[in-house]
Curated annotation (Swiss-Prot):
Lineage: Eukaryota, Metazoa, Chordata, Craniata, Vertebrata
Protein name according to UniProt: Basic phospholipase A2 trimucrotoxin
Mutagenesis or variant effect for N22A: 47% loss of PA2 activity and 67% loss of toxicity
Catalyzed reactions per annotation: a 1,2-diacyl-sn-glycero-3-phosphocholine + H2O = a 1-acyl-sn-glycero-3-phosphocholine + a fatty acid + H(+)
UniProt KW ATP-binding keyword: no
Family named by the database record: Belongs to the phospholipase A2 family. Group II subfamily. D49 sub-subfamily.
Single GO biological process annotation from the record: negative regulation of T cell proliferation
Organism the protein comes from: Protobothrops mucrosquamatus
Length: 138
């Protein structure tokens, strides 16, 4: 389900934050978010529940928590500015929401890059119904 939603968004030509986040992930991991992170574990992709499966999935859990704190922002659609140089992502100027959203995405992309060694193919396209452990608090 998570994969279908992300593919639908991309097919509709949305130019917002999800595409920017995808680019950040590509910069830090050298992998495309789709298919590698669009439905990985219990938290990478749309939604999330249960206990993160590994450090890679925990990056997505923390990212979800970060977005959850931005109650007055639109983190999945607001466009922000950022740049990168030799693998370092720098969030640019903008509204407070844009800066905070960018920082959530930057931190998650950096986390995914730092945890490439924990990535396990068995958690790609992981079904939600297997995420039954009690969810952790942010």
């Amino acid at each position: 389900m998570r994969t279908l939603w992300i593919v639908a968004v991309l097919l509709l030509g949305v130019e917002g934050n999800l595409l920017q986040f995808n680019k950040m992930i590509k910069i830090m991991t050298k992998k495309n978010a789709i298919p590698f992170y669009s439905s990985y574990g219990c938290y990478c992709g749309w939604g999330g529940q249960g206990k993160p499966k590994d450090a890679t999935d925990r990056c997505c859990f923390v990212h979800d928590c970060c977005y959850g704190k931005l109650t007055d922002c639109s983190p999945k659609s607001d466009i922000y500015s950022y740049s990168w140089k030799t693998g370092i992502i720098i969030c640019g100027e903008g509204t407070e929401c844009e800066k905070k959203i960018c920082e959530c995405d930057r931190a998650a992309a950096v986390c995914l890059g730092h945890n490439l060694r924990t990535y396990k193919k068995r958690y790609m396209f992981y079904p939600d119904f297997l995420c039954t452990d009690p969810s952790e608090k942010c």
